[in-house]
Amino acid sequence: MSAHVVRTLAELGDAITLAPERHLATRLVSGDGAPLGTLVDVRSERVEGDDLAHAVVFDTTHARDGILDVRAALRASAPPSSAKKRVHAGDLLVSRLRPYLRQIALVLPSVRTACGGRAMACSTEFYVLSPRTPGESLAFLLPWLLGDETQAILAAAQEGGHHPRVPRELLLSMRVEPERLRVRKALSARLERALRDALDARRRLSRLIEE
């Protein structure tokens, strides 16, 4: 069944975006709650020089279902040959290329420890989200970003030809429901514990395999 959206010229924004995917996805974004852009900042700081040469680099294939595959990133043998974004503990990485494939992960403090003090970097295909409130955990956003409704919006929002991407503006306009915001501190604590357990289990499994 076909669908259509009517927009005035003023609603198209500065870029005069005519891609139907943008507006069909935007139609799903309305509702109560806080726009993601009011909860996070998008950082684009680059890693350069010696830091880049020795950095642990996370590619989009290293992020899935909230967890970073640190062991796979550490196995990379060749130094980075292109620009990379700096990553800090507490950041939330969202692939702008394939978030609908669940390429989303939280950077726990234990990830920094596992990197042995080396700088952490990621592909420029990630949106690097940091909390607007210093020290706040963004773990509570994982079930929302990985939920069926949000995943459907992200899948519909892709724009472009050979490598379609999700627009930053649409991602930041998506609304986090009030109920989740009210319990975010407790929810983040539970999710961080579960993520730490999952990372520990993955680390133990890797050691057994490599023996």
Residue ranges and their predicted role:
Residues 1-49, 180-211:
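Non-catalytic DNA-recognition/assembly elements of restriction-modification systems
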Residues 37, 43-80:
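DNA target-recognition patches
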Residues 81-82, 161:
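A structural connector/turn signal
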Residues 95-145:
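A short beta-sheet element
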Residues 119-125, 158-182:
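A short glycine-rich beta-alpha junction/loop motif
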Residues 137-162:
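Short, positively charged
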